[in-house]
Design a protein with these regions (language model features):
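Acidic helix-start/capping segments at beta-turn-to-alpha-helix junctions
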Residues: 67-82, 119-120, 143-149, 217
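Conserved catalytic neighborhood of penicillin-recognizing serine enzymes
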Residues: 78-115, 121
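Beta-lactamase-like hydrolase cores
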Residues: 1-43
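Small-residue-rich helix-loop
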Residues: 132, 214-223, 234
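Mid-domain, small-residue-enriched loop/turn segments at the edges of structured enzyme/sensor domains
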Residues: 17, 113-197, 205
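Short, Gly/Ser/Thr-enriched beta-strand-loop segments that form substrate-interacting elements
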Residues: 225-246
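Flexible glycine/proline-enriched surface loops and loop-helix/loop-strand junctions
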Residues: 36-37, 95-99, 106-111, 143, ...
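Active-site SXXK
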Residues: 31, 43-71, 193
Length: 246
């Protein structure tokens, strides 16, 4: 597909929505880009998990931990939303690599919150976001906090929230967090996410082995109804999706 075709597709989608469409596309062979609102912040939902994975691999390859280190699953870290660990019994002894794999391939929120707490918010900010100069990127919350803030859960589960809202999903689209105008949030800009992905492709996040390790996990992503969905069979895609609703 030619660059001009990609530009037309982006324009078509942008014309079909009243919301800004954020796009950052780069041909890594030629350096040619297609950009739309690429420097503006957007809420990431689960797409922010790639920055958590980046800090985990930095920490492991710095010798501060091993991906084979085991930590038990606890009830305290369980998060609502996507994944399977929330439904499993506490005490399950998982490696850091297990948590990372679940976080990335099925977007497990509990695995994410374990790693977010294990690594530390400030370390993710300092060692990844600030280090790469990602001025529009924030990874301030684990998944449980993100869901609580965006949806106003206040201790309720999704069924209670649904019933309290008259059988409808609550709207957060006009919230200040969704508009990315708050001091704390989980957000990124398309061009900044593209920068992270290009570093992985070129083997320049930590080193080639670490970059390839991250990509190998991302190639196993099971939410394949989006980016890979309309691509020809056999195309290998390393990616991470994110959704605030369905």
């Amino acid at each position: 597909m030619r660059i001009e075709q990609i530009k037309q597709i982006v324009k078509q989608y942008q014309n079909g929505t009243s919301a800004p469409l954020g796009v950052a596309f780069k041909d890594l062979k030629t350096g040619t880009t297609v950009l739309a609102h690429a420097d503006e912040p957007f809420p990431t939902a689960s797409a922010y998990k790639i920055y958590i994975l980046a800090e985990l691999y930095r920490k492991a390859y710095a010798g501060e931990c091993s991906l084979n280190d085991r930590y038990p699953l606890t009830d305290a870290v369980k998060s609502i939303g996507s994944g399977v660990l929330e439904q499993l019994d506490a005490g399950l002894n998982l490696t850091l690599n297990d948590y990372a794999t679940l976080m990335m391939i099925i977007s497990d929120n509990t695995a994410t919150d374990f790693l977010f707490n294990f690594l530390g918010r400030e370390n993710i900010k300092h060692n990844v976001i600030d280090y790469l100069g990602l001025s529009q990127t924030k990874c301030d919350w684990g998944c449980n906090k993100l869901i609580d803030v965006y949806y106003g859960m206040n201790g309720r589960n999704f069924q209670q929230l649904w019933e309290d809202n008259g059988g409808r999903s609550p709207s957060y689209h006009n919230s200040k967090w969704y508009q990315c105008i708050t001091d704390e949030n989980n957000q990124t800009a398309p061009c900044e996410a593209m920068k992270m992905l290009e570093l992985l492709y070129r083997g320049k996040w930590v080193n080639r082995e670490a970059s390839e390790g991250m990509l190998n996990i991302m190639k196993q992503c099971q939410t394949n109804s989006r980016i890979p969905h309309l691509l020809p069979p056999g195309i290998v895609v390393a990616h991470k999706t994110g959704s605030l609703d369905k």
